[in-house]
């Protein structure tokens, strides 16, 4: 499994700015329209549509390759399932691998297998140029990540993947509660509590701080990232952009020059 592809998938998806963070500010109590009820109804309709689409995919997925026989979908042979997943991984048939990984995870009630299934669903998102149902695949990833953490609550990697998945789901459909909106940040903070130097958690918390205009917190996060990984020019450019947003041109130029210097050195 290409873990760098998973990481890239999550990072690229996280860059997309969303209006979901302003949703609750716009949904005031005096509004004449019950936006929460409307969004809940819309989300339920989307969920039903997603389930139907996924069920249809499962019906046809067995014919997507001749290397793995279609009867594997009804097999309970864990050794055969594991081998099939490995073959599908090699062939970059990530959706099929995700389905079988989820099946294997349910048979074994194994948190690692549930996490593998989630990763395959995320990898499928950016594997091909063909249009994908991003919401469907992200929700399937979330479903498996929730199961991973139910069985292994201290899995920090799964917490980070879940935080980003929930963030992206909130980007695609309005969250139904304040708790759902805040959960990505809470999950990331749980990771930082036990691993204060976790690069991914610090990075995502920094980006969330920028989106919510908490620039001082964002600076704190990215300066720590610089101290942990001083050779990564991206962190310097992030700091440059934050200072620019704050109107501090001098600091912005300083961090930009540092980033440019690192880029030239690497080349």
Stretches found by the model and what they are:
Residues 58-74, 88, 104-106, 118, ...:
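A conserved position within tetratricopeptide repeats
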Residues 88, 120-121, 166, 173, ...:
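Residue at a conserved register position within TPR or TPR-like alpha-solenoid repeats
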Residues 80, 113-114, 158, 201, ...:
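TPR alpha-solenoid repeat register
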Residues 91-99, 128, 133-144, 172-190, ...:
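Structural signature of tandem alpha-helical TPR/SEL1-like repeats
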Residues 2-99, 107:
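N-terminal leader/linker segments that initiate helical-solenoid repeat arrays
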Residues 75, 108-109, 153, 196, ...:
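Short coil turns that delineate tetratricopeptide repeat
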């Amino acid at each position: 499994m290409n873990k760098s592809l998973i990481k890239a998938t999550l990072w690229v998806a996280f860059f997309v700015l969303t209006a979901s963070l302003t949703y609750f500010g716009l949904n005031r109590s005096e509004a004449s329209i019950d936006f929460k009820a409307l969004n809940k109804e819309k989300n339920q309709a989307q969920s039903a549509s997603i389930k139907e689409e996924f069920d249809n995919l499962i019906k046809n997925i067995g014919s997507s390759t001749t290397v793995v026989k279609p009867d594997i979908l009804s097999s309970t042979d864990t050794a055969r399932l594991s081998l099939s997943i490995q073959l599908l991984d090699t062939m970059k048939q990530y959706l099929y691998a995700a389905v079988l990984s989820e099946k294997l995870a349910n048979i074994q009630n194994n948190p690692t297998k549930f996490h593998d299934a989630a990763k395959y669903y995320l990898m499928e998102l950016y594997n091909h140029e063909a249009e994908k149902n991003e919401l469907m695949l992200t929700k399937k990833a979330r479903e498996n990540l929730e199961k991973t953490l139910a069985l292994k609550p201290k899995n920090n990697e799964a917490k980070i993947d879940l935080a980003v998945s929930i963030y992206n789901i909130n980007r695609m459909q309005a969250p139904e509660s304040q708790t759902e909106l805040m959960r990505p940040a809470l999950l990331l903070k749980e990771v930082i509590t036990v691993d204060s130097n976790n690069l991914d958690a610090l990075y995502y918390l920094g980006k969330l701080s920028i989106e919510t205009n908490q620039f001082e917190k964002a600076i704190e996060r990215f300066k720590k990232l610089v101290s942990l990984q001083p050779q990564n020019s991206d962190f310097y450019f992030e700091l440059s952009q934050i200072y620019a947003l704050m109107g501090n041109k001098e600091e912005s130029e300083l961090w930009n020059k540092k980033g440019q210097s690192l880029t030239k050195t690497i080349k």
